[in-house]
Design a protein with these regions (language model features):
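Short, glycine-/small- and polar/acidic-enriched structural segments
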Residues: 48-188, 194-197, 213-219, 234-237
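A bilobed periplasmic-binding-protein/Venus flytrap-type ligand-binding module shared by bacterial periplasmic
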Residues: 75-77, 143-154, 251-270, 321
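C-terminal motif of bacterial Sec signal peptides marking the signal peptidase cleavage site
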Residues: 18-21
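Bacterial N-terminal signal peptides that target proteins for export
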Residues: 1-9
Length: 355
């Protein structure tokens, strides 16, 4: 009997203890959902899947043409060397367009993105059946009419009548632009003037010696001739300004940025990042001329910083992308086609040329 009473007492004490423990546990504070959110909201190196994840950089093989076409990319190249870009650029500074064409075409292309002459861009599009497209426009006209010997006889296009003009770019943008501007100002390029072609080095030498009284050169060659002549060569006409007075409905655009279509389809984020970094580079060059001139010369895009310093404002650097590209340059392509269908690869491009 005593054993039964003892057992009952032990059972009662056990139940009472269990109830007390449960009550105590229920009254203890627990970690609230808001506490855990606050804790997990601390900055971390790895964003959560729900947060806005930044685009990761990708490898891009970039080619830049030396001269005015490459000036706008100088800051991007400098940032790339300093590992300050999002994309990882393996870049090449090419001496002429033929190197770029070879690197963008064929079964084993060497470049993904390149800056090229605007007429080369449309030729690439036609040649590759859409395998290369324009993703941005980067430089307006860079051609200037120069006069040597301390003369000041040319102040308008009409003043070129009867003169011999030494020029660069036979069968390319410069020739077509010169002939068009002359024609639209009432001068027959084949009768009213004499046009002789040579490379930039030879034209510059003829200006310096006075053998050429009038010449057309692009920046920075035009800039270099003016600086080196110490006042004997002057800028008479800016062909971009002369083009604008004609109200063609399009801009005189000398540089196009192109990319292989296959690369764009496989790496759209890399293209988007490049466009942002390229636009930033152009803005930097335009607004920080002295510093940019050092970069441009350092990459060998121009012969020296003083030349780059004067050339940058003359390059009409710009950035046009997206839906604005077609209206900006299509009229220019139409003019090239009328001058020589071969200048645009035999046919005018459709809207598929623009990215």
């Amino acid at each position: 009997m005593k054993h039964k009473k003892l057992l009952a007492m032990l059972l009662a004490l056990s139940m009472a203890f269990a109830l007390t423990a449960c009550k105590k546990s229920a009254e203890e504070p627990s970690v609230s959902p808001s506490d855990s959110v606050t804790e997990s909201a601390e900055p971390s190196e790895t964003p959560s899947a729900e947060s806005s994840t930044p685009v990761m950089g990708e490898d891009v093989r970039l080619a830049v043409l030396s001269g005015p076409t490459g000036i706008g990319a100088a800051k991007l190249l400098s940032d790339s060397d300093a590992d300050a870009t999002v994309n990882h650029y393996e870049y090449t500074i090419a001496a002429d367009n033929s190197e770029l064409v070879a690197g963008l075409t064929g079964s084993d292309p060497a470049f993904d993105i390149a800056t090229v002459a605007s007429n080369v861009a449309v030729n690439l599009y036609n040649k590759t059946d859409g395998g290369v497209k324009i993703i941005a426009l980067g430089t307006l006209g860079v051609l200037h009419i120069l006069e040597s010997g301390g003369n000041e006889t040319v102040s308008s296009v009409a003043d070129l009548a009867g003169k011999t003009i030494w020029a660069v770019g036979q069968g390319a943008n410069p020739e077509y632009i010169l002939r068009y501007v002359l024609s639209e100002n009432g001068l027959d390029p084949d009768k009213d003037v004499t046009i002789l072609f040579a490379d930039a080095t030879e034209v510059t030498q003829k200006l310096m010696t006075g053998e050429a009284e009038v010449a057309m050169l692009p920046v920075p060659a035009a800039t270099a001739a003016i600086i080196k002549s110490e006042g004997k060569v002057r800028a008479a006409l800016d062909m971009t300004e002369e083009w604008d007075t004609l109200n063609t409905g399009s801009q005189l655009i000398m540089t196009a940025v192109v990319a292989r279509t296959e690369f764009m389809e496989q790496h759209p984020d890399a293209v988007a990042v490049f466009l942002e970094e390229y636009a930033g580079s152009i803005d930097y060059v335009n607004t920080n001329v002295d510093d940019a001139a050092e970069l441009v010369a350092g990459f060998g895009i121009t012969p020296s910083a003083p030349i780059a310093r004067q050339a940058i404002p003359q390059c009409h650097l710009t950035y046009i992308a997206g839906k604005d590209m077609g209206p900006a340059i299509s009229g220019y392509y139409d003019i090239l086609w009328q001058a020589d269908p071969a200048a645009v690869g035999g046919s005018l491009p459709d809207d598929g040329i623009y990215y």
